[in-house]
């Protein structure tokens, strides 16, 4: 498993299917500004100018919304994952 550094987060995108009121399936990521992802690993955080460590706002296992197109796709064994900065994460889904 990869261990992200600093404020980086390793995620795996979740395929979602959206339906309109009429029951038609819409093309998921083609029109959305965000994508849903599962957090697989989180870095230790980022240091301020005074050296204090600011802990990340997300945790392993969280479901998050990420800006579409953000991050770097890498392979971890046979699995494709994406490394993003915490600032690319828009919200945590509760």
UniProtKB/Swiss-Prot annotation:
**Which compartments is it annotated to reside in?**
Cytoplasm
Q: What's the name of the protein?
A: Co-chaperonin GroES
Asked if the record carries the keyword Metal-binding, the reply is: no
Q: Which GO terms describe its biological process?
A: chaperone cofactor-dependent protein refolding
GO cellular component terms listed in the entry, alphabetical order: cytoplasm
User: Main role?
Assistant: Together with the chaperonin GroEL, plays an essential role in assisting protein folding. The GroEL-GroES system forms a nano-cage that allows encapsulation of the non-native substrate proteins and provides a physical environment optimized to promote and accelerate protein folding. GroES binds to the apical surface of the GroEL ring, thereby capping the opening of the GroEL channel.
User: Which HAMAP family does this entry report, sorted A to Z?
Assistant: CH10 (MF_00580)
Q: Family, per the entry?
A: Belongs to the GroES chaperonin family.
- Native species of this protein? Streptococcus agalactiae serotype V (strain ATCC BAA-611 / 2603 V/R)
Quaternary structure? Heptamer of 7 subunits arranged in a ring. Interacts with the chaperonin GroEL.
Q: Which Pfam families match?
A: Cpn10
């Amino acid at each position: 498993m990869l261990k992200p550094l600093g404020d980086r987060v390793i995620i795996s995108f979740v395929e979602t299917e959206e339906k309109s009121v009429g029951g038609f399936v819409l093309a998921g990521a083609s029109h959305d500004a965000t994508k849903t992802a599962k957090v697989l690993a989180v870095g230790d955080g980022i240091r301020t100018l005074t050296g204090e460590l600011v802990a990340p706002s997300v945790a392993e296992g969280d479901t998050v919304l990420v800006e579409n197109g953000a991050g770097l796709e890498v392979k971890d064994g046979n699995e494709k994952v994406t490394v993003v900065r915490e600032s690319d994460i828009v919200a945590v889904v509760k």
